[in-house]
A protein has these predicted regions:
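Elongated, mostly alpha-helical coiled-coil "stalk/stator" tethers of large membrane protein machines
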Residues: 1-120
Length: 120
């Protein structure tokens, strides 16, 4: 019974966290820029990147193109794509070696899995 309650508590906490973050993304859409910056930091050594963001985040990221260029380096190229599948806060970066998922939902799912792995 205790284990079942712990699992339910984890799911409840994750649901509440998703709601709070969703509301925060609505109020502060610039948050996505931090998500993209962090993701780019993980794939800096690639010659070309394709950054996928949601339709809601596309304009914000497009406006930050110069800043993103300074992160990847002036000799590197990248494209920014509005992805209809991604939700606000979502980010995928395609490289020649594969795809990096770095959106808010991906990060929250990793946290949820880590909590569940701690349970017996």
């Amino acid at each position: 019974i205790v284990l079942a309650a712990e699992r339910q508590i984890i799911e409840l906490v994750m649901t509440i966290t998703r709601k709070i973050i969703s509301d925060e993304l609505e109020e502060r859409p610039e948050i996505i820029l931090g998500v993209v910056r962090e993701a780019l930091g993980r794939v800096r050594d690639q010659d070309h990147l394709n950054i996928h963001v949601s339709l809601d985040d596309y304009e914000r990221i497009l406006q930050s193109r110069n800043e993103l260029q300074s992160i990847v380096g002036s000799e590197k190229s990248f494209t920014i794509t509005a992805d209809t599948v991604l939700e606000r806060g979502g980010c995928l970066i395609e490289t020649s070696f594969g795809t990096v998922e770095a959106g808010i939902d991906t990060q929250l799912e990793s946290i949820r899995k880590a909590f569940q792995e701690m349970l017996p």
